[in-house]
Structures are given as C-alpha cells and as structure tokens.
Amino acid sequence: MKLDSFMVTRRGNPELVAPARATPRGTKPLSDLDDDWDLRYLQPCLEFFRAVDDGERRKPARPGDAIRAALAEALVYYYPIAGRLRELPKGGRLAVECTGEGVVFVEAEADVRIEDLGEPPLPTFRGAESFLCDVGDAGVVVGRPLFYMQITHLKCGGFVLGTHICHCIADAFGTLQFLKAIVDIARGEAKPTTLPVWEREHFVATSLPPNIKEEQEKLFDELENTTCDDIMVTMPAENMVSEYFTISQRDMIALRRHVPFNLTKTVTSFELLTAVLWRSRTMALGYKPCQIVRLMITVNARGRWKKLPLGYYGNGLLCPVIEITVNDLCTNSLGHTIELVRKAKHEMKTKENMQLMVDLLPLWREKPYIKVERIFETCDIKWIGQDTLDIGWAKRIGGGIPTVSLPDMTSYQFMCKNEKGDHILVFHTTNAVMHLPLVIKRK
C-alpha cells in the first residue's frame, strides 16, 4: 500500500482522562530552566508498536482501554501533568496548578498495517499528522491540558501512540520516563518502575555577580540595536520545511576519515556530526566572513548537577553557546570545530558553569522578543532509552520526533533502526541545508 493513500478511518472524540484516584491539590513552581520562553510549546512524539504474544501476557481485547487505564493510573504518580499552567501575578512566571482536571486522550483507527508504515518506520513518518491529536496552536500552553495522547489502532493489531507534552513540564528524558510509567502499568506492573520526583528547586537562579550582569546587559543592548539580516530569523514560518537525514555506520566511518588522527579515537558521534552540520549550514546560508555565527548545544545535567534524584523528570538540559566568525569557522579544519564543540561540553559540566547558566535565565525571560541571529541549535537525544518501552503484549519497533517547526527549530539527533535491525543516526535540519560536504543517504 502506498503510504499516501492511507487514512485514519475513524477518530473518536477527545476525552479528558483524570488520575485514577484522588491526588494532591496545590501549586507547584517551575524551575528557571522550565520557565524558559523557548520551552512554551507542546512537543510531539510518535511511538510505533507491533502486537506480540509472549505466552504470558496476551494482548487485551481492547488495547485502547488498557492504555487509557494505564494513563489514568500513571497520573496518580505524575499528578502535576493532570493540572494546568497558570501565569503568576508578578513577573510573568508560570506555575502548575495541580487541579486533577486530566489530560486529553483520543482513540482512532487507520486502514493500514504496521509494515505499511515502513519496516521499521523512519522519519519523516509520513502521515504523522493523522497519528497525533489536533492540539491547535502548539505555542499556547497556559490554561490548557499539558499532555495529549492518541492511540491509533492498525489492521494488524498493532498501534501507534502519538503524544504531545508541554516542554515546560518535561524534557526528552522526563517525557520518556512518563511514557515508560504508562507502559509499565499497561504491562501489568502495580506502579511505575521509576517513581517521579518534582524538586524543581534544583534549577533556581541565584544572584549574578555585577560584572556578569553588566556584560549581559551590554549584549542585550547590542542585540536590540542590530538590524536582523539572518534568513533563518526573517523567513516566514510557512516557508520552513523540516528535513530528516539518516547516517548509517558506514556513513559515520566515512565522516571519521576527515577527523585528525589525534581525535579519531575519542570524538563522539554527536561532536563529529554537530561540527559537520554547523560548518555545512554556515556555508550553505552564505553568511559574510566577518559575521558572528553561534552554536548552541545541549548538555544533560543528570548525573552531574547536585546529584539530581532518580525520577527527576523536569528540564535538565543546559545549553552553552559557542561564538566564532564565519571566516574562522570555515577556514579552519574540521578538527578545530570538533575541539570547539568538545570544549563547550566539558566547560558546562562543572557545577559553577551550570549554576551561572541558570542564573542568566531570568534576564533572558525578561526579554523574550530578542532573537539571537545566526545560531544553530542542536540536541542529542540518542540515549534517552526509547527501546525500554516494553508493554509485553506489544513491541516498540520505532519512533521519534515527527515534525520540527516553529517555535522549535532545534536540530535533533536521535537513534532508529533500519530494515536490517542496525542502529542508524537520524538528524533533522531545515531545507536551507541541502549541500552537505559528504553524500548522506536521505530517507
């Protein structure tokens, strides 16, 4: 069957699923890391499952009922997700009101088999919109449900879980933890194998040293008084197109041949691919040699920051920024760019630098209208653990982020499996980057 021809033949009415039992009421503050203007949107995700019979756990007669019940039970533990974001009277900050109102759940059916979606399904997950709830404006997060789930039943007995979650509540690792809680309970566990921890106070800003604050104010003045000439900022959103590329193990070997000998044994796939993409993107966009270009990468604070407790599901990704002129980036070697990426990663792994980045966030929150020009944002989510989504009576065969669009323009790097079962790297970029220095197989 051609994928273009499939359609969701039935979609039920959206319903609110509340926690299965009474949960605490009250207000929970967000961290300064959560309450970032750039995180005020609903992040989509797709997970594809094939029905299996393992002999011990047979598929329920109505998988949708089992998932709905598991969702309600998971919300007993993750009860803030069943609440609503409210804006506080002062400063425009957000907080979660734990109201127990619930999350949105939809059941649907599609006239298609799991193998018709790809063996296995790979981005761009064509037809992805059919597997996701209609959330309206994904950039509006106040006063609305914080989580949406659609289960689409397929002809073969498999199904697709399409979700949206408010990024202010959880990052990729936290979202996976919540999904795993639902899956654990659907598998038959009495409770999630990892119990959630809120504790957003771990990422609260302290006072800034005067010299740092002064430097930041100068940067704001410079950005506010500069006329924007970056096509990636001025181009209308409707003209932006998401593009996904896959990198096989053979492709990575080819890329590594361009790495200096002293780095070949230690460079990570993230460092290498990020360096290649940043350089290629900069060249493709035609920036002037004297202009400053920036790279923003993500560093996971888990395991590094004040011993974050097991079960913490809030935002824990910090984003150092590298600045360099176009000339210096493009005329120096690939090894030089890799060293820049590596240096930024390692410098951000100190508690002092992590705290400084959190301390700067309130200043940026006061100026949400400021757009940083010529910046490439990339995020490594290869190892968040999606393969651990084990329902028992259904096996996850693929999934990931289906679309990337405004307000989120991040280039995500994540892992999938190809038709041979081998792991391949998937990355996203915009349609402006069409001329990579190496031929990369495009799916």
Curated annotation (Swiss-Prot):
One Pfam family from the record: Transferase
Keywords recorded for this protein, A-Z: Acyltransferase, Transferase
UniProt GO molecular function: hydroxycinnamoyltransferase activity
InterPro entries: CAT-like_dom_sf, Plant_acyltransferase
Main EC class the enzyme belongs to: transferase
Active site (UniProt): 167, 390
Entry EC number(s): 2.3.1.-
Function recorded in the entry: Hydroxycinnamoyl transferase that catalyzes the transfer of an acyl from p-coumaryol-CoA to spermidine, to produce coumaroyl spermidine. Can use feruloyl-CoA as acyl donor. Contributes to the natural variation of spermidine-based phenolamides in rice cultivars.
Protein family per UniProt: Belongs to the plant acyltransferase family.
Protein name: Spermidine hydroxycinnamoyltransferase 1
